[in-house]
Amino acid sequence: MSGPRIGILALQGDVREHARGLTDVGAQPVEVRRAAQLAEVDGLVLPGGESTTIGRLLQVFELLEPLRAAVVAGLPVFGSCAGMILLARDVVDGRPDQPLIGGLDMVVRRNAFGRQVDSFEVDLDVDGVEGPPVHAVFIRAPWVEKAGDAVEVLARVAEAPVAVRQGSLLATAFHPELTGDSRMHRLFVDIVRSSGSGR
């Protein structure tokens, strides 16, 4: 049985690293740059990068509205760092014209932990991930300022939610693709399979 085809939005960010994590857990990574490709994948990863830039690129490549429609239609999506911001309902300190995909009933704060020099690493217990704590890398990371009742908080740093799930949507403020630990990718692939999208 072949693994699910998981698209990776390949406009900016850690595309290769996410592809490696997905391959490690038996998925088939596919780079996505066009709206038509969304119909060819069982799930989608929104990698880290700069959320405002990625949002603008989504508009340039005419992907924003198709992505919103895909999320509403139930496409499983995993957003890390900037991807978490893009999946939020609102951003506290974002630009007023920040394009968002939405889908997660939450408000996030960009760069909540500070600037690049304030980046840090920490071991986190993540609900749904078995084994030792997940080593999490935070780089100009957001956090969840407010989450709706349907949002399940999977991990926190100093009481701030940094990993969440709502239905088939998963988001982390940290970069699981940078550590060589593919358990967050495994969690997402399990979500894809349980949603009926996976092969």
UniProtKB/Swiss-Prot annotation:
An annotated GO BP: glutamine catabolic process
EC numbers for this chain: 4.3.3.6, 3.5.1.2
UniProt cross-references to SUPFAM superfamilies, sorted A to Z: Class I glutamine amidotransferase-like
InterPro entries: Class_I_gatase-like, PdxT/SNO, PdxT/SNO_CS
UniProt GO MF annotations: glutaminase activity; pyridoxal 5'-phosphate synthase (glutamine hydrolysing) activity
Pfam families in the record: SNO
UniProt keyword list: Glutamine amidotransferase, Hydrolase, Lyase, Pyridoxal phosphate
Binding residues annotated for L-glutamine, in chain numbering: G49, E50, S51, R110, I139, R140
Thylakoid recorded as keyword: no
Gene Ontology CC terms, in alphabetical order: cytosol; glutaminase complex
PROSITE patterns on file: PDXT_SNO_1, PDXT_SNO_2
Superkingdom, taxonomy of origin: Bacteria
Catalytic-site annotation from UniProt: C81 (nucleophile), H175 (charge relay system), E177 (charge relay system)
Cysteine-cysteine disulfides: none
Pathway: Cofactor biosynthesis; pyridoxal 5'-phosphate biosynthesis
UniProt similarity note: Belongs to the glutaminase PdxT/SNO family.
PANTHER family linked to this entry: PYRIDOXAL 5'-PHOSPHATE SYNTHASE SUBUNIT SNO (PTHR31559), PYRIDOXAL 5'-PHOSPHATE SYNTHASE SUBUNIT SNO1-RELATED (PTHR31559:SF0)
Function: Catalyzes the hydrolysis of glutamine to glutamate and ammonia as part of the biosynthesis of pyridoxal 5'-phosphate. The resulting ammonia molecule is channeled to the active site of PdxS.
Subunit structure: In the presence of PdxS, forms a dodecamer of heterodimers. Only shows activity in the heterodimer.
Protein name: Pyridoxal 5'-phosphate synthase subunit PdxT
Organism: Frankia alni (strain DSM 45986 / CECT 9034 / ACN14a)
UniProt lineage: Bacteria, Bacillati, Actinomycetota, Actinomycetes, Frankiales
Designated gene of the protein: pdxT
